Amino acid sequence: MDNALYVGLSRQMTLRRELDIVANNIANANTTGFKVEDLMVRTEQAKPAKTLDGSSPVKFVMDTGVARNFTQGPMTKTGGDYDLAINGMGFFKVQANGGERYTRDGRFTTNPEGILVTQAGAPVLDDGGGQITIDPRLGPVTVGKDGIVSQGAIRVGRIGLVRPDDLSTFAKDGDNLYRNTTNTAPQPVTDAQIHQGMLEASNVQPVIEITKLIEIQRAYESVAKMMDNTAELSRSAVERLGKIN
């Protein structure tokens, strides 16, 4: 009987974790460049409790991490000079949290020194790893699809786009940023385009996520009912043994 309760508890734990992830997806449905996440689970075989008829394999549900769907989000027009969207697989490079970080959130601006930065103030890096400085005296800023930043006839820099060989090596690092978890540096991107005056919306589909919430609730209730039935069987068995004795 105990095995069934342990299996049920393990499933409830993963359902709670999945609920947190789905709720976070919904909360970020309007976050620029956000990528939808899903829970990864696996079954783990454990040593079972002894029963009257001997031992039998028992498998528990285990949380193994979070998978992100990096498919392209919809492009929305803003008209902002410093709003940039990536069409294709690539990431902007920024200097944050003590190192180089990566993002799809192109809501950029300039700080008082004229440096191109994120909404959190992290400098946006060019293809050489340097900062990009805008001089307001040189006129409007133009960003080409190839990432070249110009003011009139003057080339200011080129926004660096990179991507890792394996997207699963990117881990969240706050402020809509990712960090590289390996010693292999992400490679420059040549087949993606930058669109000025546009932003990439989240790829979250709210209807799908709400449906998941309903399914999680039903699954949780089903597991709870199974555990209640198991506990009731245990109580009945104890009562019968008491009467026999």
Swiss-Prot record:
Against InterPro entries, the record matches this protein to: Flag_bb_rod_N, Flagellar_basal_body_rod_CS, Flagellar_FlgE/F/G, Flg_bb/hook_C_dom, FlgE/F/G-like, FlgF, LlgE_F_G-like_D1
Q: Does the keyword Cell cycle apply?
A: no
Any one Gene Ontology cellular component term annotated for this protein: bacterial-type flagellum basal body, rod
User: What superkingdom does the record give?
Assistant: Bacteria
Print the keywords alphabetically: Bacterial flagellum
What GO biological process terms are annotated to this protein in UniProt?
bacterial-type flagellum-dependent swarming motility
Q: Which Pfam families match?
A: Flg_bb_rod (PF00460), Flg_bbr_C (PF06429), LlgE_F_G_D1 (PF22692)
Q: Where in the cell is it found?
A: Bacterial flagellum basal body
Query: What does the sequence similarity comment in the record state about its family?
Result: Belongs to the flagella basal body rod proteins family.
Q: Which NCBIfam families match?
A: FlgEFG_subfam, flgF
Q: How does it assemble?
A: The basal body constitutes a major portion of the flagellar organelle and consists of five rings (E,L,P,S, and M) mounted on a central rod. The rod consists of about 26 subunits of FlgG in the distal portion, and FlgB, FlgC and FlgF are thought to build up the proximal portion of the rod with about 6 subunits each.
List the protein's name.
Flagellar basal-body rod protein FlgF
